[in-house]
């Protein structure tokens, strides 16, 4: 298919920049499955598959350098973003993909089955009702409207020495004001996306 050839070329170009060439085929399979399901179940507002490459896949992979530990949770994962691309890139890490939407979890279970991704565990539950036996090394989300809300709703999930990783667009000046924990902000560029992108890394320790 010509369309798929173009998408594969876009994907390969970006993955070369990330030095992740080896995972191209699996990411393409995920993208095609997402595009197929999205036509029926409205899993993401982005309809154009070329835009999905940059705004979904590359934006997810861009935060790889800041993931901490082996036990990761993606809260409000939706159709597995950023969790699925991260899990494909890091098969040695374990990812819990949390969402309350049944259609999205059904999609993730199908992704797990068809693509044979063994290091993900999709779970359908509201975040406040999820109480795992151990805390997570990194709690990731791009679903919360504010950093304060993210910490409020997920503080029971982060390990004692764990990390919150919030994906943002513009530098979140006002959102940082009420944060009592130590944090830093890392700006990053995404192939195919113009404008600011940053992630906020918040340690599970209070400021001194």
Curated annotation (Swiss-Prot):
The UniProt keyword set, sorted, is:
Cytoplasm, Methyltransferase, rRNA processing, S-adenosyl-L-methionine, Transferase
Where is this protein localized, as stated in its record?
Cytoplasm
Entry annotated with the keyword S-adenosyl-L-methionine = yes
SUPFAM superfamilies, alphabetized:
S-adenosyl-L-methionine-dependent methyltransferases
Report the transmembrane regions from the record. Answer: none
Function statement: Specifically methylates the N7 position of guanine in position 527 of 16S rRNA.
- What name goes with this protein? Ribosomal RNA small subunit methyltransferase G
In which organism is this protein found? Legionella pneumophila (strain Corby)
